[in-house]
Amino acid sequence: MSRRRGKVEPRKITPDPVYNDVQVAKFINCLMLSGKKSVAEQLFYDALEIIQKKTGNDPYTTFREALENAKPQVEVKSRRVGGVTYQVPVEVRPERRLALGIRWLIRYSRDRNEKGMAAKLAAEFIEAQKGTGSAIKKKEDIRKMAEANKAFSHYRW
């Protein structure tokens, strides 16, 4: 069912103060728990400092590449046709692509074994930049599932 009053305008997110980047601000907002934004900001910037110490590379570039590598191109959606549920591969919209990439990086960072959230984030960013890590594995699993169900792509809506 469509909306009566047209499209909803997306909220404007103010860029973060250090890198002046909206994607960094979104990442910090998703990292935040219980409204504690200053804690989330500190964790994020500490993680970037850890990346600087470990690799010697530009931490901001590492973050951007890690996020880009974690973004999925395709995903599968369930579609019920005649009593049978098919997993239909669909292309992911750019906004959702960013949201999923951020969500997966944070989720799999929290599951890691390093001491402290900043160290966990840093390790996940470094691995995601290299093309390894749990967030990248999740992306690849979904891509493989979409590839396996390519035969049902004509059921798109």
Swiss-Prot record:
GO terms for cellular component: cytosolic small ribosomal subunit; ribosome. One of its GO terms (molecular function) is mRNA binding. The keyword Iron-sulfur does not apply. Keywords: Ribonucleoprotein, Ribosomal protein, RNA-binding, rRNA-binding, tRNA-binding. GO terms for biological process: ribosomal small subunit assembly; translation. The keyword Ribonucleoprotein applies. SUPFAM superfamilies: Ribosomal protein S7. CDD domains: uS7_Bacteria. It holds the Pfam family Ribosomal_S7. Belongs to the universal ribosomal protein uS7 family. Part of the 30S ribosomal subunit. Contacts proteins S9 and S11. One of the primary rRNA binding proteins, it binds directly to 16S rRNA where it nucleates assembly of the head domain of the 30S subunit. Is located at the subunit interface close to the decoding center, probably blocks exit of the E-site tRNA. This is Small ribosomal subunit protein uS7. It comes from Leptospira interrogans serogroup Icterohaemorrhagiae serovar Lai (strain 56601). The gene is rpsG.
